[in-house]
Amino acid sequence: MKIFKLLSAGLLLGFGLISTAFGETVTLKFHSFAPAPASQNSKFVKPWADRIEEQSGGELKVETYFAMQLGGKPPQLVDQVRDGVVDIIWTVAGYTPGRFPKIEVFDLPFLPGSAEATSQAAQEFAQTIATEELKDFKILAVHVHSPGKIHTKDRLVMQLSDLEGLKMRGPTRVISSMLGAMGATPVGMPVPQVAPSLSNGVIDGMVVPYEIMPSFKLHELTKAHTTVSGERGLYTTAFLFLMNKAKYESLSDAHKTVIDNNSGMSLAKLAGQLWDGFEGPALELAKRAGGDFHSLSGEKLAAFKTVGDQVVTDWIAKANSNGMDGAAIVQTVRDLILKYEN
């Protein structure tokens, strides 16, 4: 009888261990520089995390840490996810200059269309052309924001010469080079530093899409806003939604399937649709805050495009010197954007 009880207890314990092994909860740590209320977190990252948990039956949980809560600075996010300090990140590719030399092509002036079309182009480009520079990561999505605009504290930019003498924040080295070519003094910094820099007079303005402005109260600190007319925006910025490769590979096949079903082209397209949708409400907030708004067109816009063309030419030359076919890369991006616009 005692032996039977011991055997029964052992079998029950064994079944318990098997059940735990198959139903084990895996926690994934997500890290980003943007604050929790920001649209990219509240309407993109959090819903994505909820889908992961729901579709895994609660076995995959995503702990979200925003505004660099786990330490470090925004340019360190890529290393944090590569090294396994965190499991997932969302960041700007250009915050680590030179790390993603092909992906940075998306930062060039007058290339982007809508965020939806350009995000799909960025995802295909990442999967086919920029594979080497992303080989250390599980790519969840590569996407962009809606075309960026020019914002200053009080000087409305209505022509190229209006940028002269202004200290303008650029998010990446490509966009900073564009601002410099257009006559401004470029100041590179991640977006969390923009509000204090405006308040302290370190910068006179910045280029960002409207969507990010409410998260950092930038619409309250700038009163002059300029956009460009036409099918191509002034610029955009490539975003990386990446997972630690070893962490992904350690998951069960079922858990990998959940991740795979919520990443790739469909996620990039969704991101683009969301970012396009974020722009309108944020613009309305800027309008309610008061100020001047202008859209460049005609000869004034042509002058900006002439400078933009030279920035592209210079980027191609630099890419060629680094062993890439710069012209082919730029043309590929243009073709991909057209593909997803049609």
Protein language model features and the residues they cover:
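Signature of the catalytic double-stranded beta-helix
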Residues: 120-128, 132
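N-terminal secretory/targeting leader peptides
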Residues: 24-116, 132-342
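Bacterial N-terminal signal peptides
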Residues: 8-17
